[in-house]
């Protein structure tokens, strides 16, 4: 198989094929994006704009021609293989790749690989990374996938390993429940229960516009030959509880029905039916109309402009009713199954199905699209995109300036080690519904519903960037959490990267709490308002084995905790909360003035006061804290002046592992 068009012209053009794959000096540096200061916060480039800095990613020929080839332009690209012409070659190769049809992505992906390497030095910021991802999505035999993956990983900050494991996330959630009873964390990964789910596969949910009815597909019914039959079911919500699911009798037949969606007015039902005599392929898309007597009928096949000789399913209708997204494995697709769409004309006729393109579709499978009508966001399930947590994951992509943005994984609060399909959101963008399976039983799908986490929110497109360094400027390891103070939307916590950086995509114009925790520094907390893309850089305050704070100066002869002590004592408390395996020793010391017996009592009273503050205010177990007063028996300097006495009047904290 030729990675480029097979040419029957001069031998020099055949050499071009090898040259495009092999030549080129490895380069790794990406151009830095420029920022500017505003109100003490660095404002960065708009996320969606940066994704679309190059119109190469629109690929206008995808639905026009199956394969693009221009021998003269290939010769011109070959002629530019000389020192100092990298910029010209980049421009010519980019213009050529831009014209690709669907078949080019299976036969000529090596051109994109070459363009990606050139783009690292010649292209706009971010373009090379998107090109590397494009190669990974469409790679075929003949390319070194490990080398491509290595290049992509070197410049891609978004990795699965950045996310904190789910079990640790739950520990953070339990901690938040204790410290903030007014804003309890929202639950995630909640099974819809026995009123909806069965012991068989349940999937394909769609929610009515009033959010009080759910339609879904189930294999709970058996045919006469004991094979499972796919049928549509529905349930209605009453007082926040779902009724027992009922079969959709007016639509179900002896054939398989599933993957339904309703029009905005609730009068048209689009669904898939398989093995039907009037079908054009294995599974076809149909529409049923709600009649005046409130029964469903007039079932019609959507016809050859939408259906193919293959498998067509998973319809999703826009609220305007003029665009239908669906999945298909028809011939001429990018992969095993692709996302397609059809647009209805003014006469009500559905147009010829069009492929959603190579940014959405991959050489693997893309299924179950859902289009968010308000924010122009396409959600879908895929096993072909570079970042994934399981087999099939849910992704989202924005329609922006005539093209789709690079799909974004909706994160570990949605995606697990199994598979997730059929993502949909209610009318208020509050709750999500989808089908998911466990890693242990990947085929047994159940329906789940819970509040939409931040990574899956349609408006979570504004980037928070930050870093954590020690006083010497070296990166520090830790975990970063972001709390939505306005709406309580859950945000998946992340590890700080090796270079000390972190980032989150958040909803703009909201108040958030940033929390940074680690083993070697005091917890950092900062409330901020998201006003455009923001950067927060912090310096960690390292924890020594023995700590003394200047703020812990008691009034003469007294042991009362003063307000100015709270900040430093809170740091100690938070560190103990973050590290339940640690033990604290509080040592109280005085100077040598006065009687030793009185000094001993005073130092003990001060140590006890601090312990009581930590136990009372932060619920830290008393067994984890020892409070000992030493009086003046352990001076750190010989007392000659009043300054020396002040140094000896101190409270020290020693942190150690519990035995």
Language-model-detected regions and their locations in the chain:
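Periplasmic peptidoglycan-binding/tethering modules of Gram-negative envelope proteins
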Residues: 455-583, 616, 620, 657-659
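Short, conserved micro-motifs composed of acidic
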Residues: 32-71, 121, 125-127, 131-467, ...
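Bacterial Sec-dependent N-terminal signal peptides
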Residues: 1-34
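Periplasmic OmpA-like peptidoglycan-binding domain that tethers envelope proteins to the cell wall
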Residues: 382-390, 579, 587-659
């Amino acid at each position: 198989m030729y990675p480029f068009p097979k040419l029957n012209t001069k031998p020099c053009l055949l050499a071009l094929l090898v040259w495009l794959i092999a030549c080129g000096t490895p380069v790794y540096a990406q151009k830095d994006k420029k920022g500017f200061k505003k109100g003490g916060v660095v404002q960065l480039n708009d996320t969606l704009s940066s994704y679309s800095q190059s119109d190469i990613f629109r690929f206008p020929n995808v639905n026009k021609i199956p394969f693009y080839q221009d021998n003269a332009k290939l010769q011109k690209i070959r002629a530019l293989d000389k020192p100092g012409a990298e910029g010209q070659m980049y421009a010519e190769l980019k213009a050529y790749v831009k014209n690709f049809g669907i078949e080019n992505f299976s036969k000529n992906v090596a051109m994109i690989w070459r363009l990606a390497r050139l783009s690292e030095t010649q292209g706009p910021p971010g373009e090379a990374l998107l090109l590397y991802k494009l190669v990974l999505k469409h790679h075929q035999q003949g390319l070194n996938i490990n080398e491509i993956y290595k290049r992509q990983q070197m410049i891609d900050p978004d990795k699965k390993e950045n996310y904190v494991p789910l079990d640790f996330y739950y520990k953070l959630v339990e901690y938040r429940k204790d410290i903030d009873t007014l804003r309890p964390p929202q639950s995630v990964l909640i099974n819809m229960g026995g009123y909806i789910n069965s012991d068989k596969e349940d999937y394909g949910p769609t929610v009515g516009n009033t959010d009080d009815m759910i339609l879904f597909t189930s294999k709970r019914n058996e045919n006469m030959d004991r094979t499972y039959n796919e049928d549509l079911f529905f349930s209605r919500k009453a007082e926040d509880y779902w009724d027992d699911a009922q079969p959709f009798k007016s639509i179900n037949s002896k054939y398989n029905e599933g993957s339904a969606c309703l029009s905005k007015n609730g009068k048209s039902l689009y669904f898939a039916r398989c093995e039907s005599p009037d079908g054009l392929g294995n599974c076809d898309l149909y529409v049923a109309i709600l009649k005046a007597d409130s029964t469903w009928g007039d079932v019609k096949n959507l016809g050859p402009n939408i259906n193919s000789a293959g498998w067509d399913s998973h319809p999703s209708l826009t609220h305007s009713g003029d665009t239908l997204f669906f999945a298909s494995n028809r011939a001429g697709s990018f992969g095993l199954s692709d996302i397609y769409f059809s647009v209805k004309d003014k006469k009500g006729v559905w147009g010829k199905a069009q492929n959603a393109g190579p940014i959405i579709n991959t050489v693997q499978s893309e299924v179950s699209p859902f289009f968010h009508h308000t924010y122009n966001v396409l959600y879908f399930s895929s096993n072909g995109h570079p970042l994934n947590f399981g087999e099939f994951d849910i992704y989202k992509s924005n329609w922006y300036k005539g093209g789709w943005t690079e799909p974004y994984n909706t994160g570990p609060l949605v995606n697990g080690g199994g598979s997730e399909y059929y993502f949909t959101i209610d009318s208020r963008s509050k709750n999500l519904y989808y089908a998911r399976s466990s890693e242990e039983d990947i085929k047994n799908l159940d329906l789940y519903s819970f509040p939409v986490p931040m990574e899956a929110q349609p408006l979570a497109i504004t980037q928070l960037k930050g870093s954590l360094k020690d006083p010497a400027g070296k990166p520090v390891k830790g975990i970063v959490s972001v709390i939505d103070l306005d709406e309580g939307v859950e945000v998946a916590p992340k590890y700080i990267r090796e270079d000390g950086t972190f980032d989150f995509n958040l909803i703009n114009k909201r108040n958030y709490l940033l929390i940074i925790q680690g083993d070697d520094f005091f917890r950092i907390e900062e409330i901020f308002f998201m006003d455009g893309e923001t950067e927060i850089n912090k310096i960690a305050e390292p924890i020594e084995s023995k700590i003394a704070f200047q703020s812990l100066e008691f009034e003469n002869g007294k042991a009362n905790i003063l307000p100015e002590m709270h900040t430093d004592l809170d740091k100690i408390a938070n560190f103990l909360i973050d590290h339940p395996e640690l033990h604290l020793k509080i040592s109280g010391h005085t100077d040598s003035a006065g009687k030793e017996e009185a000094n001993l009592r005073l130092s003990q009273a001060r140590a006890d006061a601090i312990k009581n503050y930590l136990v009372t205010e932060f619920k830290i177990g008393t067994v984890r804290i020892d409070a000992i007063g030493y009086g003046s028996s352990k001076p750190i300097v010989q007392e000659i002046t009043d300054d020396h006495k002040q140094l000896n009047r101190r409270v020290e904290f020693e942190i150690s592992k519990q035995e």
